[in-house]
From Swiss-Prot:
Residues 384-396 have a biased composition (Polar residues). Residues 267-326 bind DNA. Residues 352-365 have a biased composition (Low complexity). One of its GO terms (cellular component) is nucleus. Residues 69-130, 131-193 form the LIM zinc-binding domain. GO terms for biological process: dorsal spinal cord interneuron anterior axon guidance; negative regulation of DNA-templated transcription; neuron differentiation; neuron fate specification; regulation of transcription by RNA polymerase II; thalamus development. This is LIM/homeobox protein Lhx9. It comes from Danio rerio. The keyword Nucleus applies. It is found in: Nucleus. Keywords: DNA-binding, Homeobox, LIM domain, Metal-binding, Nucleus, Repeat, Zinc.
Length: 396
C-alpha cells in the first residue's frame, strides 16, 4: 500500500531576462547563463515527482486531466493531490477501509485482500487463518495462547468438557472420543456406557471395577499408571489388586483390570497389602503416638506412599489390637490369682487370627463402605460377653 499519486501539473517556462540585467555582458555569456537556468529548472521538476515513503522512494505518476483516475472504493473521481494504490487500484485516503470493522487503513503498514475485499490484519486472520479452533471453528491468531489435544487446537475458553462445559486447564485429566473433549468423570462414564446426569465421582468409585481408560495430561501424550494384578474369580478368594504403594496422584489415568460385574453379582471387596518399609514406618510412629492427627498423617503419607484413608484404618485397627492385648494381660493376671493361667499373648499375627478366617479391607476410595470386616478370634471364648472384634491380618 503506497501513496503514489500526485496531481501536480508540470509547466515549463522560458526565462527571458531583461536586457538591462545583462548590461555589459557579452552574448555568449548570456546564452550560457540561460541554458544553466533551464537545466536546473528541469532537475527541480523531476525531484518534485518523488516522495519518501518508509525509507524508499516511490515515483508518483502524474494523472493526465483527460483521463482522471476513479476510486475503487466509492467510484468517484480522485481530485486529491495524494491517493493510495492497493491491489493495483486507486483509492481515496478516506475510502481504503476494512470491509469488516471499517477501520481506516491509510495509516496502517499492511492490509489484506481476499476475493476483492479489503481486510485489516486482525479480521483477515480471524476469518482466513489456517489454524482454526476445533470447538468454535473460528480463526486463531499467531499471538494467541491455545490448548492442543492430539491434532486439534482450541481457544483457552473453548477447551471445555462437552457434557458439563467445565473449563479444562493445564494439568487436568481429560479424554477424547470422536474429536470431542470430556472431563475425567464423564469420559469414564461414557466408556462404560453408564452415564447418568446426576452421577458423581464418589458413586462411580463405589461401583468397583472399570475399563482401562486413557487420560491426557494437557501435553498431547498418554501416560500410563502402574498396572495392577488380579486373580481369577473362579478361585473364590478376594482380589488383591489394590496396590497400597500408589496414591491418587501417581498415575495420570485410572487403570482398572477388573471388568464390571453383572448387576446380579456383588462386587468383591478389595484387599490391602503393605510393604516391609511401610510397616516399619507405621510401627515406629505407633510406638510414639497411637492417634496421629491430620498433619502427622500427611507426613506419613509422603513417607510411605499410602493414602490418608489407608493410614487411618491401619492406626484404628492398631489401637484396637493394642487395647485387646492390654485387656488380655489384665485378665491373665486375675486368672493366675484364681489358680488358673492363660497362655501369654504372642506377637505373631497367626495366634490372633485363625488361618481359616480371611480378613479383608474394602475399597478405600469410598469412605461410606465399611472398611474392615468382622473377624472372630479363637481367643474370644476367654472374653465372656464381649462382642466380636475387628482386626487386620499381619498387623505386626
Amino acid at each position: 500500500m503506497e501513496v503514489v499519486g500526485c496531481k501536480a501539473k508540470e509547466s515549463s517556462c522560458t526565462l527571458r531576462p531583461a536586457a538591462m540585467l545583462f548590461h555589459g555582458i557579452s552574448g555568449d555569456h548570456i546564452q550560457g547563463i540561460m541554458e544553466e537556468m533551464e537545466r536546473r529548472s528541469k532537475s527541480e521538476s523531476r525531484l518534485a515527482k518523488t516522495v519518501q515513503m518508509n525509507g524508499r522512494e516511490t515515483t508518483m505518476p502524474s494523472m493526465s486531466p483527460e483521463k482522471p483516475a476513479l476510486c475503487a472504493g466509492c467510484g468517484g473521481k480522485i481530485s486529491d493531490r495524494y491517493y493510495l494504490l492497493a491491489v493495483d487500484k486507486q483509492w481515496h485516503l478516506r475510502c481504503l477501509k476494512c470491509c469488516e470493522c471499517k477501520l481506516a487503513l491509510e495509516s496502517e503498514l499492511t492490509c489484506f485482500a481476499k476475493d476483492g475485499s479489503i481486510y485489516c490484519k486482525e479480521d483477515y486472520y480471524r476469518r482466513f487463518s489456517v489454524q482454526r479452533c476445533a470447538r468454535c471453528h473460528l480463526g486463531i491468531s499467531a499471538s494467541e495462547m491455545v490448548m492442543r489435544a492430539r491434532d486439534s487446537v482450541y481457544h483457552l475458553s473453548c477447551f471445555t468438557c462437552t457434557t458439563c462445559n467445565k473449563t479444562l486447564t493445564t494439568g487436568d485429566h481429560f479424554g477424547m472420543k470422536d474429536n470431542l473433549v470430556y472431563c475425567r468423570v464423564h469420559f469414564e462414564t461414557l466408556i462404560q456406557g453408564e452415564y447418568h446426569p446426576q452421577l458423581n465421582y464418589a458413586e462411580l468409585a463405589a461401583k468397583g471395577g472399570g475399563l482401562a481408560l486413557p487420560y491426557f495430561n494437557g501435553t498431547g501424550t498418554v501416560q500410563k499408571g502402574r498396572p495392577r494384578k488380579r486373580k481369577s474369580p473362579a478361585m473364590g478368594i478376594d482380589i488383591g489388586s489394590y496396590s497400597s504403594g500408589c496414591n491418587e496422584n501417581d498415575a495420570d489415568h485410572l487403570d482398572r483390570d477388573q471388568q464390571p460385574y453383572p448387576p446380579s453379582q456383588k462386587t468383591k471387596r478389595m484387599r490391602t497389602s503393605f510393604k516391609h518399609h511401610q510397616l516399619r514406618t507405621m510401627k515406629s510412629y505407633f510406638a510414639i503416638n497411637h492417634n496421629p492427627d491430620a498433619k502427622d498423617l500427611k507426613q506419613l503419607a509422603q513417607k510411605t506412599g499410602l493414602t490418608k484413608r489407608v493410614l487411618q484404618v491401619w492406626f484404628q485397627n492398631a489401637r484396637a489390637k493394642f487395647r485387646r492385648n492390654v485387656l488380655r494381660q489384665e485378665n491373665g493376671g486375675v486368672d493366675k490369682a484364681d489358680g488358673t493361667s492363660l497362655p501369654p499373648p504372642s506377637s505373631d499375627s497367626g495366634a490372633l487370627t485363625p488361618p481359616s478366617t480371611a480378613t479383608t479391607l474394602t475399597d478405600l476410595t469410598n469412605p461410606s463402605i465399611t472398611v474392615v470386616t468382622s473377624v472372630t478370634s479363637s481367643l474370644d471364648s476367654h472374653e465372656s460377653g464381649s462382642p466380636p472384634q475387628t482386626t487386620l491380618t499381619n498387623l505386626f
